[in-house]
Regions:
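NAD(P)+-binding Rossmann beta1-loop-alpha1 motif at the extreme N-terminus of oxidoreductases
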Residues: 1-46, 51-53, 126-127, 189-191
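Single conserved hydrophobic/aromatic residue that forms the stacking wall/gate
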Residues: 208-216
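Aromatic-residue-lined binding/catalytic grooves and analogous aromatic/hydrophobic interfacial grooves
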Residues: 173
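Small-residue helix-packing motif on alpha-helices
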Residues: 30, 40, 58, 194-202
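Short, well-ordered alpha-helices that flank and scaffold nucleotide-derived cofactor binding pockets
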Residues: 13, 17, 21, 45, ...
Length: 216
């Protein structure tokens, strides 16, 4: 399957890494474009994917087109690519707050749309991603898209009205927990404990079973 990424920031890099680690595609089947040539060069060096330098070309090449840009830039990106023939392509957006209906309105076309919300632990392959599928996504593409999302963590399929709820739980909560751990460690360091030990004592250790989790 050919996969295209418009936007090659941290989340796109996490997704590309997961796809390659799980052998869902080879680098030659992954296309990408970014706002700057520096980002494209960096991602090409990291993963060996094809960088196009052109959102239109990325869209043309992809079977699964992933819109990995921030919400404030999404409308502009869609405007750049919506006039080409996107028949047969599945469009996956990871922009927060942009509904399936909004995507269809912007593209002015009845395409297969997917909305997903990954979180920052995806950067280390431990993400929790909420996903909802539009009615035009075929079972085959749903399976392939789910495999991509599963490649960097756990995926939870939800009705769309719960996507914003998920954002509050899994999108923001990891950052809050990281800040709490940092603050606890800072307190221990202030009392003379080495930072490495402070972090170790603050972290939650996780076994294969959530029931076996213990705090150290």
């Amino acid at each position: 399957m050919k996969i295209g990424f418009i936007g090659l920031g941290n989340m796109a890099q996490a997704m590309i890494g997961g796809v390659l680690r799980n052998h869902l595609a080879v680098p030659e089947e992954i296309y990408g474009s970014a706002k700057t040539a520096e980002t494209e060069s960096k991602v090409h060096e990291m993963f060996g994917i094809t960088v196009t330098g052109d959102n239109l070309e990325t869209a043309r090449q992809a079977e699964l087109l992933i819109l990995a840009v921030k919400p404030q830039f999404l409308e502009k990106v869609i405007g750049q690519i919506s006039d080409i023939d996107l028949t047969g392509k599945t469009i996956l957006s990871i922009a927060a707050g942009k509904s399936l209906a909004w995507l269809e309105e912007q593209f002015c076309a009845p395409l297969p749309f997917v909305r997903a919300m990954p979180n920052t632990p995806a950067l280390v392959g431990e993400g929790c991603t909420g996903v909802c599928y539009g009615s035009r996504v075929t079972p085959e593409m749903k399976e392939k898209t789910a495999a991509v999302l599963d490649s960097f963590g756990k995926t939870v399929e939800l009705p769309e009205h719960l996507m914003d709820v998920l954002t509050g739980v899994s999108g923001c909560a990891p950052a809050w927990i990281f800040m709490l751990i940092e603050a606890m460690a800072d307190g221990a360091v202030a009392k003379g404990m080495p930072r490495s030990q402070a972090y170790e004592c603050c972290l939650l250790y996780t076994s294969p079973s959530p029931r076996d989790r213990t705090r150290s």
